[in-house]
């Protein structure tokens, strides 16, 4: 018998564990297409996916956090904080598009490091630490922007949020790539196994030689980067930066629903 390739094995394992989700999605699409003729059109599906990109990207980082038994309430603050500073520098012509994006992502790392420090070093409960972090970062963003909408962003900045490749929005392709990378990391790498172990039983993970504090610290950094990336996507779509738009409560709620899939709850830890 011929051995199956690694790629085939990965696809089969993925469908075995997540197949039910795709079946439900397929049924929903069929029902929607019965009532609306244009539901399955390329343009409509692209728009639907594009609308879910921001919550979807943030949910990637939240999945890592929840799997370790933590929670991160600083997502909204991190988004508006990183986006405000990056777009302000960009609108004033102090940096280019590429530099502005890098600055936003680094600010996301900074917020993640701050959260990780509060939780793993100062031993603060994740709920309290990240809630405080959210208020601090949102307040800083409000101070920096003086409560005003940041406009005058260059047109080339819109390529992340509005550009399409073969009819598919670039931001959708970016989200899909990030999901594939996250799935491979969690399923097939030592780091992913350590994340699961930390969430399942911290003491057992520590006794087995896993640096639990480092793993927990790292997932908040990942969440910070994902949050900052959401800020990039949102501001590149609108070519403006407003606090009300970036700190969308409905999106924040939906972002928490993404990781609370039954399999993630079973494999991850309890919320702190």
What are these model-derived regions, one by one?
Residues 21-33, 62-63, 134-139, 174-184, ...:
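Hydrophobic core segments of alpha-helical transmembrane domains in multi-pass membrane transport
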Residues 26-93, 117-123, 252, 258-266:
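Single transmembrane alpha-helix segments in multi-pass membrane proteins
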Residues 181-221:
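Membrane-helix/interface signature in polytopic inner-membrane proteins
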Residues 94-134, 177:
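Alpha-helical transmembrane segments within multi-pass membrane transporters and channels
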Residues 37-47, 186, 192, 220-256, ...:
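Inter-helical junctions in multi-pass inner-membrane proteins, predominant
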Residues 18-23, 48, 56, 77-81, ...:
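Hydrophobic alpha-helical transmembrane segments
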Residues 1-20, 31, 40, 267-269:
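Transmembrane alpha-helical segments of polytopic membrane transport and secretion proteins
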Residues 122, 126-189, 215-218, 234-246, ...:
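Transmembrane helix-bundle core of multi-pass membrane transporters
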């Amino acid at each position: 018998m011929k051995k199956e390739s690694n790629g085939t094995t990965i696809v089969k394992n993925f469908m075995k564990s997540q197949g039910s989700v795709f079946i439900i999605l397929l049924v929903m699409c069929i029902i929607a297409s019965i009532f609306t003729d244009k539901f399955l059109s390329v343009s409509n599906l692209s728009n639907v996916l594009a609308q879910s990109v921001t919550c979807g990207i943030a949910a990637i980082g939240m999945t890592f956090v929840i799997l370790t038994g933590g929670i991160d309430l600083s997502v909204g603050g991190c988004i508006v904080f990183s986006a405000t500073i990056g777009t302000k520098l960009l609108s004033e012509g102090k940096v280019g598009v590429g530099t502005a994006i890098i600055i936003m992502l680094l600010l996301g790392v900074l917020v993640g490091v701050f959260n990780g420090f509060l939780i793993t070093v100062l031993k603060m409960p994740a709920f309290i630490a990240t809630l405080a972090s959210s208020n601090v970062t949102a307040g800083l963003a409000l101070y920096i922007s003086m409560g005003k909408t940041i406009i005058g962003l260059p047109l080339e900045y819109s390529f992340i949020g509005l550009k399409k490749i073969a009819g598919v929005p670039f931001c959708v392709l970016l989200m899909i790539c990030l999901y594939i990378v996250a799935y491979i990391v969690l399923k097939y790498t030592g780091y992913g196994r350590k994340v699961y172990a930390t969430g399942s039983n911290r003491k057992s993970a520590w006794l087995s030689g896993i640096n639990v504090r480092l793993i927990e610290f790292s997932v908040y950094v990942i969440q910070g980067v994902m949050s900052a990336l959401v800020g990039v996507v949102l501001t590149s779509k609108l070519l403006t930066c407003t606090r009300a738009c970036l700190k969308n409560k409905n999106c924040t709620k939906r972002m928490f629903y993404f990781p609370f899939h039954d399999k993630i709850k079973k494999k991850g830890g309890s919320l702190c």
